[in-house]
Amino acid sequence: MAPFGFRGYNGRVRAAALAVALFGLGAVVVTTAAAAPKPHVERARAGAVEAVFSYSYDAAAFRFSRQRLVIDRDGVTSFAARLRKPPGGGFNAQPAGYFAHRRSVFVTDIDGDGEPEVVLDLYWGGAHCCWYSQIYRYAPATKRYAPLVHVWGNFGYVFADLAHDGSQELVTRDDRFSYAFASFADSRWPVRILRYRAGRLTVETPTYRSEIGRDANALWHAAMNPKRKASNQGIVAAWAADQCLVGHAAVAFKTIDRLSRSGKIHGELSRVKFEQKLRSFLRRTGYLS
């Protein structure tokens, strides 16, 4: 199941992280200043491979430190290093599962080749962004582990064997839709499915039409909910992306135009500007050719 899910940190963490972003570390005081940083150790194992993720947490400063990952094979250390600063200018590499009382390090054979990878899920400390993962792959020729860093953005991911072939796809949401057509609260995101092979992640979403169909159906019902008063342009944009992936772009845009004229699709953008921006955005992001 999921190392961490789509929803981001809980309310307590979002509020604290937002205060840090706006006012600095001194703004967040959740315990007495005298409390010392508390050390933590997480362990994960599969076969002969064991990963140990250690760190300290200072609750008064809302800050993690001394983050270190060690990977052993048959009891012999093959990798040991302190974590680098997060990509994208994040202020702190936080264990993604810490505040949900879950592990953030996993040993699992993602690609089904018999050699387990080590996955470290992290968060870099914003109101709801950003989640990222470090995936460590063993290279027998060099007897070393090489990391791949992937930024998920405002969402996490789940592992799922969608192809039923023994390998695991990584299912997430397309974060590029955040704020594109509405506020974050009124944005929605089409499903995005990645495959890990030979140390690389590739987008394989179009392969999984049934997953796209289920996602499109849920988005459509959300957009057309008669109780919804806020903008639904962000939801419709995500739905249109799904439709493009299954070859229904022309029908989707006709539907959008008809419902925009009747007022059932509404938001900050006028009908013409929304349709123009949506076409341009879907071309730029690879959904529409």
Q: Locations of the language-model features?
A:
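Acidic, small-residue rich beta-repeat scaffolds with periodic aromatic anchors
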Residues: 34-63, 172-289
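Bacterial N-terminal signal peptides
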Residues: 17-28
